[in-house]
């Protein structure tokens, strides 16, 4: 995907546990906490009222009165992750409370300093990332019940009501559907090392089924997310301050830096799932798309980024299949690539509905109950990309990866 990575092939068997990837939940954080220690009650009290405070244009005033708290009393990974989730939501709400016409240019030190501190502890940037919005931001209503949307709720929220909850929780279910695929690519990588062609074939078949299940689950967006609400009411709170015309200079983190800092907004490209699939299948994207995707890895938990890099460093699946001369392996590989291309085509139809069509509709008059839709990113993803050309390029490069028998 990018030229500057060392091309060292590893022969060490992979295991999910060593990358803090759950056997049951994949990249989702199992047993996310809902409360921080009492010392951080000032954060939680505001975070739990976030939608109401933003709607009343009172969030900035409440944040400005917050005490400056150190992160030293956060114990363990889950408390750190919840703190990052809470502070990221406070930050996005603070910056975008008045919409894109009046974004906050300075993040006050009582929010900026602890946010940067916990971000450094976790190896994450000080902005809302996919890890916050989705991977950490879910809990079961009934702990013994199934992982399905009726039994899930978010921990922290923005304005957007049920559509916002649906967007987050359907995305969490997509991550859950990826778990068999993540396990399959580990099994396949280890099968190449053994080598065991039968185990490799079975793993490729499981990967294809997982990708197809991801596509089906993504379709639940239609049931739970209203396009008008997503476009005009939710999307702005996922927007960053890099490649965003509404904030060309970036955001000043008071007490952290003398210059404004620039970070990309939340993006599906920050999900580790498709990066891992691409590396395993040997899919190479165009320089522009590849550079953006590679940069998004810095917005992932470091252990998840390391997983992608180790998949990249593993022996090449494509080379192994071509050298094996086994048509059934080549067919199974191509079915995985085809399924991935179909997933990406479906994603394009979703973006067309929730971004392109919704933007055109908003241009001709917004519903009275929604704020004015953001214009600065009207044809761009919240990560700052020219979204349709990016998605089509990624889909087309996936299709170009179809293998043909040698000879």
Swiss-Prot record:
Detected in liver, small intestine, spleen, placenta, thymus, lung, brain, kidney, and colon. Also expressed at low level in testis and thyroid. Not expressed in the majority of human tumor samples (>99%). One of its GO terms (molecular function) is metal ion binding. One of its GO terms (biological process) is immune system process. The keyword Heme applies. It is an enzyme of class 1 (oxidoreductase). The keyword Heme applies. Keywords: Dioxygenase, Heme, Immunity, Iron, Metal-binding, Oxidoreductase, Tryptophan catabolism. Pathway: Amino-acid degradation; L-tryptophan degradation via kynurenine pathway; L-kynurenine from L-tryptophan: step 1/2. It comes from the Eukaryota. Heme binds at residue 347. Activity is inhibited by D-1MT (1-methyl-D-tryptophan) and MTH-trp (methylthiohydantoin-DL-tryptophan) but not L-1MT (1-methyl-L-tryptophan). One of its GO terms (cellular component) is cytoplasm. Its cofactor is heme. Binds 1 heme group per subunit. Its EC number is 1.13.11.-. It catalyses: L-tryptophan + O2 = N-formyl-L-kynurenine. Belongs to the indoleamine 2,3-dioxygenase family. Catalyzes the first and rate limiting step of the catabolism of the essential amino acid tryptophan along the kynurenine pathway. Involved in immune regulation. May not play a significant role in tryptophan-related tumoral resistance. IDO1 and IDO2 are 2 distinct enzymes which catalyze the same reaction. IDO2 affinity for tryptophan is much lower than that of IDO1. 50 % of Caucasians harbor polymorphisms which abolish IDO2 enzymatic activity. IDO2 is expressed in human tumors in an inactive form: tryptophan degradation is entirely provided by IDO1 in these cells. IDO2 may play a role as a negative regulator of IDO1 by competing for heme-binding with IDO1. Low efficiency IDO2 enzymes have been conserved throughout vertebrate evolution, whereas higher efficiency IDO1 enzymes are dispensable in many lower vertebrate lineages. This is Indoleamine 2,3-dioxygenase 2. The gene is IDO2.
